């Protein structure tokens, strides 16, 4: 237990990174996390820092999560810029960020997208940003990932046929 499970944490443009141990499934539980202001980052990384492969997953569980107005959250499972793979919430040897309590208030999903929360990765010189959903048993998961919601894609560079309930990228 690296951090007391009931310790409240307030982020004001800050970050939390949980590195799992190599060769083993790792877990950590934190108390109530409040996103007070600014751009915040929470990462759960399987394997040792600097490792390009992971054996074992890393599950970071938040007792609850609250987001104040003017605060946002980037959830990631990689902190290495040379790995272009957003595997957050995937089954297997990857990072997961879970919330014990329900996502309420301004974090309550709208069309299955969690407002104010996104996932990003660095991919060959460009930043790729995805909307995020919450999947029971997997936690935060970027849209478009296997087993998650998909983006509406009619083909080409158009929004033809999109409705107010479609998620368009």
Model features per residue range: what roles?
Residues 1-169:
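Beta-strand repeat architectures
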């Amino acid at each position: 237990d690296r951090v007391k499970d009931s310790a409240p944490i307030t982020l004001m443009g800050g970050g939390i990174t949980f590195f799992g141990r190599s060769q083993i499934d790792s877990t950590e539980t934190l108390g109530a996390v409040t996103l007070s202001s600014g751009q915040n980052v929470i990462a759960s990384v399987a394997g040792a820092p600097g490792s390009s492969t992971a054996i074992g997953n890393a599950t970071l569980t938040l007792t609850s999560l609250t987001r104040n107005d003017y605060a946002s959250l980037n959830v990631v499972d990689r902190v290495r810029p040379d790995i272009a793979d957003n595997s957050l919430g995937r089954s297997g040897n990857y990072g997961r960020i879970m919330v014990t309590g329900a996502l309420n208030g301004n974090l309550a999903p709208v069309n299955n997208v969690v407002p104010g929360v996104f996932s990003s990765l660095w991919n060959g010189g460009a930043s790729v940003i995805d909307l995020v959903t919450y999947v029971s048993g997997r936690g935060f998961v970027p849209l478009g990932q296997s087993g998650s919601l998909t983006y509406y894609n009619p083909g080409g560079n158009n929004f033809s046929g999109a409705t107010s309930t479609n998620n368009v990228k």
